[in-house]
């Protein structure tokens, strides 16, 4: 396992009768295809050549009409993001290069946690707190927050320069402060092509996890996304995190499945739950 945090690298392949975009994520030992078009047979053959033993997981966001073909080629469905492709669903389909990556000893425990999330009555929100949009000037303080909350994180959020880079690349941050330090933050990574955004980088210092802090931040991000004409949101939450899954469930995100040993986060490899929401309905 590679212990050095390395930024993922995106590469676009343009061939005669197809194109696809692949992210090489060496820290998490995976490749991920977020967009493809053209000859499916050629695309899958090409993916097979780049899915080397350096990686243990391959993920493709598959359009609904292509699911059966991917199944016939040995891929499995791990989850679904509602309305990912301009209102059409995306199916996350996977291949593996290692048995350990495919198997999860905590699956039943995480099923039980999800059932408890559904049973839990939402606690009342506190009065809307002071929140603001993050700027590049906050990068150092945000990096300190992520270092405080996560021993391991799947992207280089401990690096202020990386935070500045994602801000420049259409990621919006909202944050809360107390005693001149950031105590909670969340971001929305915008995909303007497909009119969606990933709600991510959610972190709250342990002493500030009361009163619906993260719910307030995500609701603020949702309103900001609507201003940006982004109509669909999704999030990928740690399957072991009762609090984060409860936040998404209580904000009317729909559960869409679980990604096995998807990333290194918090302290180890973890399964991740998929959640998605059509923001248009929440604004009606």
Protein language model features and the residues they cover:
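N-terminal charged segments
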Residues: 1-53, 68, 100
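A conserved beta-strand-loop-helix scaffold within acyl/acetyltransferase catalytic domains
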Residues: 12-30, 143-206
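Conserved acetyl-CoA-binding loop-helix of GNAT-fold acetyltransferases
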Residues: 38-49, 204, 210-227, 246, ...
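Conserved GNAT acetyl-CoA-binding A-motif
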Residues: 51-62, 225-237
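Conserved beta-strand-loop-alpha-helix junction that forms the acyl-donor binding cleft
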Residues: 59-67, 235-245, 249, 262-266
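Conserved catalytic-core motifs of GNAT/GCN5-like acyltransferases
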Residues: 61, 76-91, 254-271
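Conserved active-site tyrosine of GNAT-family acetyltransferases
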Residues: 69-70, 75, 247-252
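A short beta-loop-alpha structural element at the N-terminal edge
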Residues: 128-142
């Amino acid at each position: 396992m590679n212990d050095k945090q390395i930024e993922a690298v995106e590469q676009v392949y343009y061939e005669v009768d197809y194109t696809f975009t692949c992210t090489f994520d060496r820290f998490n030992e995976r490749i991920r295809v977020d967009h493809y078009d053209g000859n499916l047979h050629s695309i899958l053959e090409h993916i097979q050549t780049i899915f080397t033993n350096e990686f243990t997981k391959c993920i493709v966001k598959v359009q609904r009409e292509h699911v059966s073909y991917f199944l016939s080629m040995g891929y499995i469905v791990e989850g679904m993001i509602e309305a990912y492709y301009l209102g059409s669903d995306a199916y996350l389909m996977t291949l593996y290069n290692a048995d350990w990556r495919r198997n999860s000893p905590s699956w039943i425990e995480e099923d039980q946690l999800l059932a408890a999330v559904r049973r839990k009555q939402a606690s009342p929100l506190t009065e809307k707190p002071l929140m603001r949009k993050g700027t590049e000037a906050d990068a150092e303080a945000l990096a300190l927050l992520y270092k405080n909350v996560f021993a391991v994180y799947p992207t280089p959020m401990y690096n202020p320069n990386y935070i500045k880079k994602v801000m420049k690349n259409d990621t919006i941050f909202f944050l809360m402060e107390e005693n001149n330090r950031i105590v909670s933050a969340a971001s929305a990574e915008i995909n303007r092509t497909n009119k969606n955004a990933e709600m991510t980088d959610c972190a709250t210092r342990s002493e500030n996890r009361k009163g619906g802090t993260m719910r307030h931040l995500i609701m603020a991000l949702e309103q900001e996304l609507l201003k940006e004409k982004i109509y669909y949101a999704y999030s990928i939450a740690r399957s072991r995190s009762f609090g984060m899954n409860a936040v998404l469930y209580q904000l009317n995100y729909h559960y869409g499945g679980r990604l096995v040993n998807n990333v290194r986060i918090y302290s180890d490899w973890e399964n991740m739950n998929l959640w998605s929401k059509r923001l248009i309905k929440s604004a009606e």
